[in-house]
């Protein structure tokens, strides 16, 4: 088994009870990163940054039950379905307002984790995984690495 495959399998296993967002800088000048969000044995592509202060700071965050909301704005929708989940940093930072959400409209975010879905089904699946976990557990740990 390759090292990359072993590492990916371990991240998937570790993401059963938390979200792990792993990114790589793709454009340091524009502070743009691309990555994979791992959660509950699933993987979803995302981007972070390109605008404002750029990609999300690495670290630990928390999301809370009751904060996952439907959104109608184009920048929070893909395939006609929009939502967002605010993230609270668990470390000292001057950044605020970071969220998980579909990356609708013009590609890029102000630092949020902007998810890129292949279909409406994938978008709804991610939303439902987050909703169901938060309904059961009240708090979701999120790590950006």
Model-identified regions with their sequence ranges:
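Cell wall/extracellular polymer interaction/catalysis modules
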Residues: 1-110, 120-145
């Amino acid at each position: 088994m390759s090292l990359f495959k072993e590492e990916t399998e371990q991240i998937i296993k570790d993401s059963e009870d938390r979200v792990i967002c792993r990114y790589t800088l793709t454009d340091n000048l524009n502070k743009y990163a691309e990555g994979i969000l791992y959660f509950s044995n699933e993987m979803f592509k995302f981007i972070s940054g390109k605008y404002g202060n750029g990609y999300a700071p690495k670290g630990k965050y928390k999301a809370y039950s009751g904060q996952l909301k439907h959104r109608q704005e184009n920048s929070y929708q893909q395939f006609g379905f929009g939502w967002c989940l605010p993230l609270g940093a668990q470390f000292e930072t001057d950044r605020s307002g970071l969220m998980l959400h579909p990356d609708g409209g013009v590609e890029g975010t102000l630092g949020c984790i902007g998810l890129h879905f292949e279909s409406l089904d994938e978008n709804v699946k991610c939303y439902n995984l987050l909703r169901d976990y938060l309904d059961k557990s009240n708090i979701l740990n999120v790590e950006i690495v």
